[in-house]
Amino acid sequence: MTLKSLPAWTALQSHFEQIRHARLRDWFAPENDRAPTRAERFTIPGGGLAADFSKNRIDDETLRLLVQLARDAGVEARRDAMFAGEIVNPTEGRAALHTALRATDPQAPFHAQVSAERAKMATFARAVRSGTWTGYTGKRIRHVINIGIGGSDLGPKMVVHALHHVATPEISTHFVSNVDGADLARVLEQVDPEETLAIIVSKTFTTLETMTNARSLRDWFVARGCPEDALAKHFVGVSANPAEVVKFGIAADNVFEMWDWVGGRYSLWSAVGLSIMIAIGPEQFDELLAGANDMDRHFREAPLERNLPVLLGLIGIWYRNFFGSQSYLVAPYSEALHYLPSYLQQLEMESNGKSARLDGTFVDYPTSAVTWGEPGTNGQHAFFQMLHQGPTIVPIDFIAVLTPEHPLAGHHPKLLANCFAQSEALMLGRTLEEARKVAGPGKEALAPHLTFPGNRPTTTLLVDALTPRTLGALIALYEHKVLVQATVWDINPFDQWGVELGKILGKVVEGDLSAESVDPAKHDSSTTALIERARAALKR
């Protein structure tokens, strides 16, 4: 059966018409919000986190029908198939076993292989952190440069930044992803080659951006005095293609393995996270894995009605497919989580930005929403105006860390107050009558500008303290949310064919930029004109 023919879908359509104009402020009114309160009913713990879903435009019947939709769509079966190592990425004929990277059960798929590679990572990380692994002049490593793009960059960068407070102060970690040379050049201004270790991360070890930066970095080392036969002290590779790593010039002993059954955007738990392990240490890296495993167990064991990834995913579907929301916002009220929205952009949109169903037919309903965000309180002074008073409804995930990871007094209560106040203001709004009172006598014309529609839906995720364990759980929560939504939408969240066409055409255009002339028949007139302008500029 297709999604729209499922009984729960039909029931949700009828239910939506019944409650689409219901007001959250009415549901929270004292005469309606009796014990157990709405907040008590809709706040759910799991995996060391808690989620307050009460400020969403849902009632008990909404959740009942959404959970039935998950059952009808086969969420439980697909979840179990993924954990069992079955082929859940049919377009590439692969399993999706990122969960095996943090599993503690010896019977988990590839457990021995995963454990051996993690032990190799730990040995290397300890050597770098302790100073026993040195550069070619005998100086200890003080800078690590991670070169990768997409999942080989966004996840590690996000985690290293988030866990800065538990990282060693002896080593600075830098991330280079963009093929724009300015990205690498800016980092090279900050480092000494004698004290720098490069980690080159690419599943194929042929990725254009990564290999361009890797070659430039290798040339930089040599130009600044590092003998070519000493580069092994400064370069390691992470790849599913070891032969290509060795061909590049990295010693075979310096190659760490990743596997084709782990997608790039799910890979920070593997050797792709080597930069994380060097920064925070093997023991803390194990805690990161343990937190993800906590959420894995919750996802597998909790009933769907009390299952955080399931509910987060289903509520997202409620807004995307019934309310017609085009985007959703992630607002972590934590500067440590600065890069979480960027990480989730790839996780959500590269996974679920698809139009083809698993059977090859095309969907007739929206799939992935546009994912965006910025840490609070910065976002309040940029785009919250639109969230409060614009005509577009944007569902929001607020993320609040209850305990600060810094010693500065007076900051954290203000941060939390802003987070909670924003969710309340978005829910309550301000009526025209209330606005008239705020405007005051004689300022009737101002009142419409002081109104807030309210009824804007938000979820608040609560993290007691930002530790490797709670961060691991938070990341895994969103990973599993993506699977839930993909299953309901009947799409494959583990491939990314949408990035291929641009790559293919990019190689053609790159050749044309250095050619004597460009055949106008090769491209449309716009692209041809752009190439000609660029060719002229490159010759200056």
From Swiss-Prot:
GO molecular function list: carbohydrate derivative binding; glucose-6-phosphate isomerase activity; monosaccharide binding
Alphabetized UniProt keyword annotations: Cytoplasm, Gluconeogenesis, Glycolysis, Isomerase
Cystine pairs: none
Matching Gene3D superfamilies: 1.10.1390.10, Glucose-6-phosphate isomerase like protein, domain 1
GO biological process: gluconeogenesis; glucose 6-phosphate metabolic process; glycolytic process
PROSITE patterns according to UniProt: P_GLUCOSE_ISOMERASE_1 (PS00765), P_GLUCOSE_ISOMERASE_2 (PS00174), P_GLUCOSE_ISOMERASE_3 (PS51463)
Full protein name: Glucose-6-phosphate isomerase
